[in-house]
Amino acid sequence: MYALVWTARFTRSAKKFADRHGELRTKFSNILRDLENDPFQPHLKYHHLGGKLKGIQAVSITDSYRISLTVAITDKEIILLDVGSHDEVYR
């Protein structure tokens, strides 16, 4: 089991995301629960980012929406960085 660490930025973007996309609230909550259990589950589509975002990972909520994060495997922590559309998260 991993501990989810909510950054201030993630907290703001998660609230905005939930307000704008009420239809995805349940899916978003389920993704966070699944991340806590095992971030490497295939349906999360966990992947490493490159370029200016090297060192950051992401998981998919849907084809259009992502959560960016950093996984500290030794500490069993997942540091949540941002949530939003593909373009918002990868800016």
Residue ranges with predicted function:
Residues 84:
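Residues forming the ATP-binding cleft of Hanks-type serine/threonine protein kinase domains
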